């Protein structure tokens, strides 16, 4: 699960001007009807993964992968965008990967001591001042808030997916399954996603090949051609979060509650383990405040289906 960083003292500045809309790097999905929610009864009650309910979506486009460090760097270079983590001056880093002077270690999160608030941690320095993203251009960008993700999407001529679009896309055409590839976590003894193995939060055996983030085209894509819809990094959705929303959700193209305190997160991350998180299931939900950031928060973009490819933004 992600953890909130304290809110910046100043309000976020207006985002960049919207670019012409683009479907570059995206897969077109036909839409249609699907059963949304947890059919296995494995979710946390407070997450509101039930009742399973029928949703019907119009066709839409969605990114094949999470947004990478390289793509986010292009956005920052073009716009001068300053992330919420940079504005506040610190962000949440998992305790085993902190790379910062002792003076930059500002303390742990209440109830989640494995999360350390690190001065100077942000998307360019994801583990702290002694880290950088050299050699990681194709890893998902992290330490990005919902506000940052929305600003990027606007610049790229895209938008964030709705929660319903995200789950439909993540399922890869499989109905009623636990994961994007079926019901077994490791079919044939092979890992299909980047999550925690070992004893959380102190021992990660990295059987899946990764201790932290993995390149965005690791493992296999799902049936829709989307990569890493389970694990690696949490992905922001456009919706406000409510644990009771599924009981009142409209059937056609739901967009979430009209207001709220937190935005929806989907997909789980490299820190998910069944003893702690278990949110790499395709129906799993989480949430965080729009200005929160951490070393396992990222995003991918979506768009309407009546568009043609073409923006030069990326």
Swiss-Prot record:
Chemical reaction(s) catalysed:
L-cysteinyl-[sulfatase] + 2 a thiol + O2 = an organic disulfide + 3-oxo-L-alanyl-[sulfatase] + hydrogen sulfide + H2O + H(+)
Task: Give the UniProt keywords, A-Z.
Answer: Calcium, Copper, Metal-binding, Oxidoreductase
Stretches with biased composition (Low complexity): 1-20
Residues the entry annotates as binding Cu(2+): 272, 277
Q: How is the cofactor bound?
A: The catalytic copper is required to activate oxygen and catalyze oxidative C-H activation.
Q: In which pathway does it act?
A: Protein modification; sulfatase oxidation
Q: Which family does it belong to?
A: Belongs to the sulfatase-modifying factor family.
Entries under InterPro entries matching the protein: CTDL_fold, Sulfatase_Mod_Factor_Kinase, SUMF_dom, SUMF_sf
Q: From its record, what is one biological process in GO terms?
A: post-translational protein modification
Q: Which SUPFAM superfamilies match?
A: C-type lectin-like (SSF56436)
Job description of the protein = Oxidase that catalyzes the conversion of cysteine to 3-oxoalanine on target proteins. 3-oxoalanine modification, which is also named formylglycine (fGly), occurs in the maturation of arylsulfatases and some alkaline phosphatases that use the hydrated form of 3-oxoalanine as a catalytic nucleophile.
Provide the transmembrane region boundaries: none
Q: What is this protein called?
A: Formylglycine-generating enzyme
EC supergroup of this enzyme: oxidoreductase
Keyword Metal-binding set for record: yes
Q: Where do the annotations place Ca(2+) binding?
A: 194-195, 208, 210
Q: Which GO terms describe its molecular function?
A: calcium ion binding; cupric ion binding; formylglycine-generating oxidase activity
Q: Has keyword DNA-binding? A: no
- The EC code for this enzyme is 1.8.3.7
Q: Where is this region: Disordered?
A: 1-31
Q: Which cofactor does it need?
A: Cu(2+)
Name one matching Pfam family: FGE-sulfatase
